[in-house]
A protein has these predicted regions:
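A short, proline-enriched helix->beta-strand linker immediately N-terminal to the Walker B motif
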Residues: 13-17, 46
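C-terminal portion of ABC ATPase nucleotide-binding domains
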Residues: 31, 38, 60-105
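Conserved catalytic loops of ABC-family nucleotide-binding domains
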Residues: 42-51, 59
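Conserved helical "switch/dimer-interface" subregion of ABC/ABC-like ATPase nucleotide-binding domains
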Residues: 35-43, 55
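ABC ATPase nucleotide-binding domain signature region
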Residues: 3-6, 33
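Catalytic Walker B motif of ABC-type/P-loop ATPase nucleotide-binding domains
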Residues: 19-23
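Short coil-to-helix N-cap segments within the nucleotide-binding domains
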Residues: 27-28
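Hydrophobic anchor residue at the start of the ABC signature
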Residues: 8, 52
Length: 105
C-alpha cells in the first residue's frame, strides 16, 4: 500500500493534465482505498483521469466506466446505469459486494 501511495504522490507532483492510475489501489484494503479515493477526488476534478481497476469500488464514482472482458468493450456507462442493466458489470459488482461482506465477518 505504501509503495502505491508514494507513486500516486509522485504523479500528482507533476500536475499532469491526464492522470492514469493503473490498478494503483490493488494492494490496499477497501477502507484504505476509500480514504485514498476521497483524497484524490479534488485532484481529479478539472483533469482527465483514467482509473484502471479490477475492483468496482475503485471506479464507482467515475463519470464513465468502460468494462472490458478479454480485451473487448462489453459495456459502458455510469455505475448506476451499469448496475441497472444487469450485465457483466452488475454481476461483478454483486460478487465483490458479497466478498466484502464475507471479509467483514
Amino acid at each position: 500500500g505504501q509503495k502505491q501511495r508514494v507513486a500516486i504522490a509522485r504523479a500528482l507532483l507533476r500536475d499532469p493534465r491526464i492522470l492514469i492510475l493503473d490498478d494503483a489501489l490493488a494492494s490496499v484494503d477497501t477502507l484504505t482505498e476509500e480514504r485514498i479515493l476521497m483524497g484524490l477526488l479534488p485532484v481529479m476534478r478539472g483533469r482527465t483521469t483514467i482509473l484502471i481497476s479490477h475492483r468496482v469500488s475503485t471506479v464507482r464514482q467515475a463519470d464513465r466506466i468502460v468494462v472490458l472482458d478479454h480485451g473487448r468493450i462489453v459495456e459502458q456507462g455510469s455505475h448506476a446505469e451499469l448496475v441497472a442493466n444487469g450485465g457483466y458489470y452488475a454481476d461483478l459488482y454483486q460478487k465483490q459486494l458479497l466478498e466484502e461482506e464475507l471479509e467483514a465477518i
